[in-house]
Amino acid sequence: MKANNTTTSALWLQITYITMEAAIGLCAVVGNMLVIWVVKLNRTLRTTTFYFIVSLALADIAVGVLVIPLAIAVSLEVQMHFYACLFMSCVLLVFTHASIMSLLAIAVDRYLRVKLTVRYRTVTTQRRIWLFLGLCWLVSFLVGLTPMFGWNRKVTLELSQNSSTLSCHFRSVVGLDYMVFFSFITWILIPLVVMCIIYLDIFYIIRNKLSQNLTGFRETRAFYGREFKTAKSLFLVLFLFALCWLPLSIINFVSYFNVKIPEIAMCLGILLSHANSMMNPIVYACKIKKFKETYFVILRACRLCQTSDSLDSNLEQTTE
């Protein structure tokens, strides 16, 4: 009887997990496609920072389209070849690191904007932006795919079983030493600390500029006022990323020391990490005025079935 109850509760946990993953994936895809559409339509948002925001949105769309379906497949523990399971698990990691690298790029860009106000446009050329974006994604793929090049559990599994197939589960193929020391500490925790320091310096610079006697320099005060609001909004995006990803990272860290973690805690940690991908569009809508205005224009246009010409004219009115 007790075994039946355990099986039933495990089944309900799996059904609930899959349902919530599907809902999160749908919201992440729709919300972040809307973010990209907003940047495409609103010319005033085509700045360096928003190129990096689009990069972050692409990573979040990939979470909805690729990561969540693969996470569901991995949770079902389907029987497959070791390297097929490992590749699926690595894909989950690639887009996590794409998000953190995009956030780092955004932080560096905002820092350059307030630190090198006059030289900013000459430093952040179009070519350098694309090079930096390419570097961010290259690092993400290299870090995420590292287990494919040998840092995995194949040798451990070969010692315990002769078959090359297994019930695919993330921890069956990816070692906790990689997850804790390389993926988390080196490529998530350290960048998070660096970004916090960058934002603290940004706020310090802006506060100093605003506290100076800038009588007669209204434009300068207005510039730093806008930068302060934007920095606060983007720091909130960073804070939410940390809030969503640290619980799962802490679970992995604790598990490394052979502490048994309840299955429900693991599921909640995974769901929270994936939920981060649907939060950013909401933050932009609430905190960035131009985003909010363009969202409303798009929603109004969709409701009234407007043509692209009328949509453009409405956008011109909002940007004036």
Curated annotation (Swiss-Prot):
PANTHER family registered for this protein in UniProt: ADENOSINE RECEPTOR A3 (PTHR24246:SF2), OLFACTORY RECEPTOR AND ADENOSINE RECEPTOR (PTHR24246)
Phosphothreonine: modified positions: 307, 318-319
Transmembrane residue ranges: 17-39, 51-74, 87-108, 129-150, 180-200, 234-257, 264-286
Keyword Disulfide bond belongs to the record: yes
Tissue: Testis, particularly in spermatocytes and spermatids but not in spermatogonia. Low levels in the brain.
Keyword Transcription regulation listed: no
Protein name: Adenosine receptor A3
GO biological process: one example: mucus secretion
Domain of life: Eukaryota
Keywords: Cell membrane, Disulfide bond, G-protein coupled receptor, Glycoprotein, Lipoprotein, Membrane, Palmitate, Phosphoprotein, Receptor, Transducer, Transmembrane, Transmembrane helix
Glycosylated residues, chain numbering: 4-5
A molecular function (GO) term: G protein-coupled adenosine receptor activity
Purpose: Receptor for adenosine. The activity of this receptor is mediated by G proteins which inhibits adenylyl cyclase. May play a role during reproduction.
PTM comment text: Phosphorylation on Thr-318 and Thr-319 may be crucial for rapid desensitization. Phosphorylation on Thr-318 may be necessary for phosphorylation on Thr-319 to occur.
Main location: membrane
Result of altering residue 307 to A: Small decrease in agonist-stimulated phosphorylation
Membrane-protein topology: Multi-pass membrane protein
S-palmitoyl cysteine: lipidated positions: 305
Protein's organism: Rattus norvegicus (Rat)
Topology, Extracellular side: 1-16, 75-86, 151-179, 258-263
Cytoplasmic compartment segments: 40-50, 109-128, 201-233, 287-320
Stated family: Belongs to the G-protein coupled receptor 1 family.
Location within or outside the cell: Cell membrane
Cystine bridges: 85-168
GO cellular component, one term: synapse
InterPro entries: Adeno_A3_rcpt (IPR000466), Adenosn_rcpt (IPR001634), GPCR_Rhodpsn (IPR000276), GPCR_Rhodpsn_7TM (IPR017452)
